[in-house]
C-alpha cells in the first residue's frame, strides 16, 4: 500500500505568509500531493475561511475558493477549527468533491458524533478522525494543562467518539498509537512530519495510511514507488 501525502497548510513549506492560500494549494496539486490539508475557521462575520490562526477580520481565504483549487485529482484533508456548526464547513467540501477524496479531522471530541449524525443523510461513509492535538479549552490553568496532557493519551477519547481514522502526532504514533490503530483495523494519519529521515520512515511504513507534511515535494521524492 502506498502511503498518501497530505500537504500541510496547503503545502507552503517555509513560506509562512503563503500558508493556506489558493496559490499554495495549486502548487501542491501540481507537485502531485494526494491530499491538501487546510484549517477551517469562521470569520467574525460568519464566513467559512481557511487559515492557521483564528481570523480577526474578513481578509481570510474563502473555503470555497480553496476547495475549487483542488481540481479533479487532489483530495481534501479538512482540519476543522470549529466547535459548533461543523457540518456547514463540511457541506461545502462534500458539495464539490466525491467522498472518497475527503477526510475530516478535528481535536474537538463532541464534533465527531455531530458530524456522524449529519453524515448519515448528507455524506454516508464520510471519514472522520479525532486528532491527538489538544482540545480547545478556556478554563482555568489546571484544566488547560489537563486538556494538553490528555492529548498524549487519546485512545479512550477516540474509542468513545467512534473514529474512522486515527490522527496522531508522529511521536505518539511511533510509541503506542500506531499499534492501537492496527489492532482495530483503523487507518493511521500521522502529523506533521518534515525531517528527511522521518519522512523516509513514515512514507515507507506499511501500517501508515497518510502523512501530513509541510514539504510534500520531499515526501513524494522519498516515498517508495
Predicted regions and their residues:
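Phosphate-group recognition and catalysis centered on beta-loop-alpha active-site segments
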Residues: 1-225
Amino acid at each position: 500500500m502506498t502511503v498518501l501525502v497530505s500537504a500541510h497548510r496547503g503545502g507552503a513549506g517555509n513560506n509562512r505568509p503563503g500558508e493556506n492560500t489558493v496559490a499554495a494549494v495549486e502548487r501542491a496539486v501540481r507537485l502531485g500531493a494526494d491530499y491538501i490539508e487546510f484549517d477551517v475557521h469562521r470569520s467574525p462575520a460568519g464566513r467559512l475561511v481557511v487559515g492557521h490562526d483564528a481570523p480577526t477580520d474578513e481578509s481570510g481565504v474563502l473555503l470555497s475558493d480553496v476547495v475549487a483549487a483542488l481540481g479533479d485529482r487532489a483530495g481534501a484533508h479538512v482540519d476543522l477549527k470549529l466547535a459548533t456548526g461543523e457540518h456547514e464547513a463540511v457541506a461545502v467540501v462534500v458539495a464539490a468533491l466525491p467522498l472518497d477524496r475527503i477526510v475530516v479531522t478535528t481535536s474537538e471530541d463532541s464534533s465527531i458524533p455531530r458530524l456522524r449524525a449529519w453524515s448519515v443523510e448528507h455524506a454516508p461513509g464520510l471519514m472522520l478522525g479525532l486528532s491527538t492535538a489538544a482540545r480547545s479549552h478556556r478554563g482555568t490553568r489546571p484544566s488547560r494543562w489537563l486538556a494538553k496532557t490528555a492529548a498524549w493519551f487519546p485512545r479512550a477519547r477516540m474509542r468513545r467518539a467512534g473514529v474512522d481514522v486515527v490522527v496522531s502526532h508522529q511521536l505518539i504514533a511511533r510509541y503506542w498509537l500506531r499499534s492501537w490503530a492496527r489492532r482495530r483495523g483503523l487507518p493511521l494519519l500521522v502529523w506533521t512530519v518534515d525531517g528527511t529521515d522521518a519522512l523516509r520512515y513514515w512514507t515507507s511504513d506499511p501500517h501508515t495510511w497518510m502523512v501530513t507534511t509541510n514539504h510534500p515535494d520531499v515526501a513524494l521524492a522519498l516515498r517508495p514507488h
